[in-house]
């Protein structure tokens, strides 16, 4: 939220609509909870928990093992395990590379530890603005459950409009990108 407040201070803005795209949806929700000058908020996509999004790319047993290894600080083993998964999945490879780039981390272990900070459960009840939540019905990265969870967590929002885009609109995927026809 501090960068948003700094920008609003610099430009002497008293009311703003804040729009967050992809991970920015999570960041915009977090900023709105702390910044009363944000009057309206648009989040597409909605990421309630970046750590969970990344771990869901693995099967149940490796997911549990990864959580334990992260708690134990087993950096080399975590990095090796994630490298094996990334080799088989372009989505995991992309998510890992993009995640490390955005968070300024240099390993899978570091990124997963940092990803725990990117969640909305602790701030959602503080959001009092008008909120528009957008999601794709077949998002390859963010599970649709997080969209439903975010709607439920916004207990004090002034208003909530939630829109789920579908394949028939060519907007079913992450950030409402689909297979757009020419």
Question: Which residues fall in each region the model found?
Answer:
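Short glycine-enriched nucleophile-adjacent loop
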Residues: 18-20, 25-36, 41-43
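Alpha/beta-hydrolase active-site loop
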Residues: 1-12, 30
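Short beta-strand/loop motif that positions the catalytic acidic residue
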Residues: 127-128, 133-135, 139
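Catalytic histidine-centered segment of alpha/beta-hydrolase-like enzymes
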Residues: 163-181
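Helix-rich cap/lid subdomain of alpha/beta-hydrolase
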Residues: 61-96
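Active-site nucleophile loop of the alpha/beta-hydrolase fold
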Residues: 42-53
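Active-site nucleophile elbow and catalytic-triad environment of alpha/beta-hydrolase enzymes
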Residues: 105-123
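Conserved alpha/beta-hydrolase "acid-adjacent" motif
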Residues: 140-146
């Amino acid at each position: 939220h501090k960068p948003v407040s700094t920008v609003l201070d610099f430009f002497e803005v008293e009311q703003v609509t804040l729009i967050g795209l992809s991970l920015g949806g999570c960041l915009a929700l977090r900023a709105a909870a702390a910044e009363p000058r944000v009057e309206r908020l648009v989040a597409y996509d909605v990421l309630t928990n970046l750590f969970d999004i990344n771990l869901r790319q693995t099967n149940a047993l490796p997911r549990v093992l990864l959580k334990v290894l992260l708690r134990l600080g087993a950096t080399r083993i975590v990095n090796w395990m994630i490298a094996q998964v990334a080799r088989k999945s372009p989505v995991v490879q992309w998510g890992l590379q993009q995640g490390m780039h955005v968070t300024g981390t240099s390993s899978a272990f570091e990124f997963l530890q940092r990803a725990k900070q990117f969640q909305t459960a602790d701030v959602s009840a503080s959001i009092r603005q008008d909120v528009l939540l957008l999601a794709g019905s077949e998002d390859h990265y963010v599970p649709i459950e997080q969209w439903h969870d975010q709607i439920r967590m916004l207990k004090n929002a002034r208003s909530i409009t939630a829109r789920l885009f579908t394949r028939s609109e060519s907007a079913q995927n992450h950030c409402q990108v689909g297979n757009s026809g020419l």
